[in-house]
Swiss-Prot record:
This is 3-((Z)-2-isocyanoethenyl)-1H-indole synthase. Its EC number is 1.14.20.11. GO terms for molecular function: metal ion binding; oxidoreductase activity. It comes from the Bacteria. It comes from Fischerella ambigua (strain UTEX 1903). Involved in the biosynthesis of ambiguines, a family of hapalindole-type alkaloids. Responsible for the synthesis of Z-3-(2-isocyanoethen)-indole, a biosynthetic precursor to all ambiguines. Belongs to the TfdA dioxygenase family. Fe cation binds at H105, D107, H254. Gene3D superfamilies: Clavaminate synthase-like.
Amino acid sequence: MIVSTSVEQSAQFSVKSLTPFGALLEATEDHSDIQQLSIEQLCQLTWEHRLIVLRGFSLLEREELSTYCQRWGELLVWNFGTVLDLIVHQNPENYLFTNGNVPFHWDGAFAEAVPRFLFFQCLKAPEAGSGGESLFCDTVRILQNVSPQQREIWQKTEISYKTQKVAHYGGEITKSLVIKHPITGLSTLRFAEPLNDASVHLNPLYVEVCNLPAEEQNPFINELIENLYLPQNCFAHEWQEGDFLIADNHALLHGRNPFLSNSQRHLQRVHIL
């Protein structure tokens, strides 16, 4: 949802603020070339707004997408390469490749390095009203708005995560809940939400708060999750074919709403370190 008209202008695009955060960059001419835009300017807009959506630009071929993203920085290479196709698999082994929801998480948790940016392009979008929105949570905003007492508790918290590696990630890790953003220096939350009732229960993630009694685990995690989904903290992007979306993977957590099984949802994603 757009809440204000242009807040910044460029000869190549206009910028409109989204609510509760984010910015929409609309090309001044249809089928413009995203490769002609200033990457430095796009980086600054992403740091400022947490995420940017670019609309009215021509899609990139798979190899072209990977080559372009290399101009942003080193790419995280997985067993499938650099470009992940986010589509429904006929016989999925992981919930990412179903039409169920994807709980909030950060990317790169089980990798050697955490990406700075998530870079998406939308090849096919679900029909309006059929679900499949990508969700983003501004964890900087959460930490700025919770009570000092809650912030202090979270700053002392470590959480362990464990999942079997049947897709391109997996293992067992322990991470501090609150970390500093490596670019902006702001405090952020690093949390991965376990599967829930709207999830397809394939390859689940097991979450445990370190040094917390068993009877306090669920209340602690549930309170944290409630903050993630508050309207003032959560942005749902309804995809349109041809959309690009660039997200700050350090400041944001992201997930997905479930969608109809016959929806033709096809995104491509690249991790930029």
